[in-house]
Amino acid sequence: KYFNFHSKRKCIITQSTLNKKPNSDNFKNAQSKAALAALLFSSITPHAIALDDAAPIASPPQVMEVEAPNPNTSNPLPFSQNLVLNAPKTQASPVSDLPESTQWRYSEFLNAVKKGKVERVRFSKDGSALQLTAVDGRRANVIVPNDPDLIDILAMNGVDISVSEGEGGNGLFSVIGNLLFPFIAFAGLFFLFRRSQGGPGGPGGLGGPMDFGRSKSKFQEVPETGVTFADVAGADQAKLELQEVVDFLKNPDKYTALGAKIPKGCLLVGPPGTGKTLLARAVAGEAGVPFFSCAASEFVELFVGVGASRVRHLFENAKSKAPCIVFIDEIDAVGRQRGAGLGGGNDEREQTINQLLTEMDGFSGNSGVIVLAATNRPDVLDSALLRPGKFDRQVTVDRPDVAGRVRILQVHSRGKALAKDVDFDKIARRTPGFTGADLQNLMNEAAILAARRDLKEISKDEISDALERIIAGPEKKNAVVSDEKKKLVAYHEAGHALVGALMPEYDPVAKISIIPRGQAGGLTFFAPSEERLESGLYSRSYLENQMAVALGGRVAEEVIFGEDNVTTGASNDFMQVSRVARQMVERLGFSKKIGQVAIGGGGGNPFLGQQMSTQKDYSMATADVVDSEVRELVEKAYERAKQIITTHIDILHKLAQLLIEK
């Protein structure tokens, strides 16, 4: 009664039915069973019979109903009359080898295409992915690599190909999206520019293109620099000139009653560190009028024409506040001589200086604005700046003398605890040629040394050590010096000192040291004459003595250690001697053969519109004479130094031994 049907149409009669023993009931239905068996086996194909493996049961056994034969019905077929078989219709389900997921690998996609199981594909807009539709209706997505043969494979297998138009689908939105970013960027830049100019965007300082033309000068309606003329020492003549300018601003009637006119400009000239800017700050603190200050380097910037624009803007503001003072520091940055002609291009500084000249004394005039300027390079300034009507006064701020250095030391010692042994006069005499900035640095270094040594006061020792540190560099206390090297350096420095001390009309010896400082293994300090230093006048005998003193170190090495054991320690001495001897022959007229003739003059700076190169204004024969004269001066100085050392060799030994011991 029970039958299992496999998908391959194999039929198996259940063992429980066949194993039943025959009885009367079974025998009665023998004909029906025989007919049923004949029908079933007739439907089995030879292929199905050949498959003798047991098939898994796919579903529960189906109940088959067999009706009893009807005697009233005739059927020509044996065993089949009145037999009705009501069985469910079965069909084998096809097995699919397509992937079950919705995301296929590219290899799976190609296999399906080649087997004809892909009906159509739809590529994305950028071609990086596609969506397929299989023949059974399912859909899947595939990531497409860069395969140039893919389109040909799809076409050969009859696959319908299409391309997506994108997600937007509307060209208007695409155009708007492309224009939106540039518009936002332009609006942002416009907002920043407006903000930098104090427009509706609000005040700000981010800087805009129109802000380049504005002057960056610092303005003080009531200057509070904290500096007055009482704080300026060592520049009495310069201070007097500027005090007159301040008095002109405070009491103009005193001068105009006599027909005097206010100076248009005042140029402060002097070496670096002499107090030019300090004097300008003192003028601002004393004048009591509006004060504009700027650096000349601030005029020239990125864009062409900015320098002239800033000069105009500066003087517009100054004229609105007249009477006032405009201070331009380091004016040589824009006031260099015009017309050099090198490079073939436009120099922005020329436009700036032209505008400055016009504003100071142009067609429109300039009333009530005094221009102060400072420079340490007056030789590079344009001649138009230096003429009357521009900078009417040139105030030279030179290095202070002894009395000026004493007053400067007193100013910079305010607020510092000094010991009783500090003598400003002695310090001033040991610092010839020092500027105000140098003396300020000296006192500051002395205070640092005192603090490093845990002292409560600054003594003369700290000031002396600070002076040597500034001149020669810091001590190399940890330097390992052998006894042989120490002895050599001691005799070398003793030779300098001995020749200098016994040479007539030369500077006195101030200090000898064999402690390494900076690049020097030892130093001999001489105290130059204040009168000679200030006047700048040096006699022939002084220059010859200077060369002999410089050669004293090499002579001492040669006498004590022999010619084969001399060292390179005298290399700088030789350079100094050669320079002095050549100047004596070529420029100073101290040669009998050359006479009072200056030869070998420099050609000037081509960047200042001067000569492009050095011109040789003497013959080769004259050059040979110059060389022989220089060599003769050096040899004469060497013999003088050697004579002094050999004559006083005992003093040399004692001095060297004293240096080694201390």
From Swiss-Prot:
In the N-terminal section; belongs to the AAA ATPase family. It is a multi-pass membrane protein. GO terms for biological process: cell division; proteolysis. It is found in: Plastid, Chloroplast membrane. It is an enzyme of class 3 (hydrolase). This is ATP-dependent zinc metalloprotease FTSH, chloroplastic. The chain crosses the membrane at residues 35-55, 173-193. Pfam families: AAA (PF00004), AAA_lid_3 (PF17862), Peptidase_M41 (PF01434). Binds 1 zinc ion per subunit. Seems to act as an ATP-dependent zinc metallopeptidase. Its cofactor is Zn(2+). GO terms for molecular function: ATP binding; ATP hydrolysis activity; ATP-dependent peptidase activity; metal ion binding; metalloendopeptidase activity. GO terms for cellular component: chloroplast membrane. Its EC number is 3.4.24.-. Zn(2+) binds at residues 492, 496, 573. ATP binds at residues 270-277. The keyword Chloroplast applies. Keywords: ATP-binding, Cell cycle, Cell division, Chloroplast, Hydrolase, Membrane, Metal-binding, Metalloprotease, Nucleotide-binding, Plastid, Protease, Transit peptide, Transmembrane, Transmembrane helix, Zinc. PROSITE patterns: AAA. SUPFAM superfamilies: FtsH protease domain-like, P-loop containing nucleoside triphosphate hydrolases. Its main location: plastid. PANTHER family: ATP-DEPENDENT ZINC METALLOPROTEASE FTSH, CHLOROPLASTIC, METALLOPROTEASE M41 FTSH.
